[in-house]
Amino acid sequence: MAHKKGTGSTRNGRDSNAQRLGVKRYGGQVVRAGNILVRQRGTKFHPGNNVGIGSDDTLFALIDGVVMFERKGKTRKKVSVYLPLTAVETAPAEAVAS
């Protein structure tokens, strides 16, 4: 027989790190090319105009612009990046005058 009581093991004692998923840039925010827009598991949000998708379903901006969240059909959502309206609307005064 053992002279000392053996210590019992426990099956607890682990805690994994958070995955930090979710929307990282919201609608109307200005983003640079390469900025991560959404980190997700599966395609809760689908890529729209000027948005790429990574191997882990992360959505990222392909151009500098403004983020827009839109509907894609009845049930799906998509994220797009468009050029800011101010850059398109405001032209140099010399170009307008001539």
Curated annotation (Swiss-Prot):
Q: Where are the stretches annotated Disordered?
A: 1-22
User: PROSITE patterns of this UniProt entry?
Assistant: RIBOSOMAL_L27
Q: Which UniProt keywords apply?
A: Ribonucleoprotein, Ribosomal protein
Q: Does the keyword Metal-binding apply?
A: no
Citing just one GO molecular function, the answer is:
structural constituent of ribosome
Query: Might you name a Gene Ontology BP term for this protein?
Result: translation
For this record, an example GO cellular component is:
cytosolic large ribosomal subunit
Compositionally biased intervals (Polar residues): 7-19
Keyword Ribonucleoprotein assigned: yes
Q: Which InterPro entries match?
A: Ribosomal_bL27, Ribosomal_bL27_CS
Regarding protein family, the annotation reads: Belongs to the bacterial ribosomal protein bL27 family.
Cross-referenced NCBIfam families, in alphabetical order?
A: L27
Q: What is this protein called?
A: Large ribosomal subunit protein bL27
In which organism is this protein found?
A: Nostoc punctiforme (strain ATCC 29133 / PCC 73102)
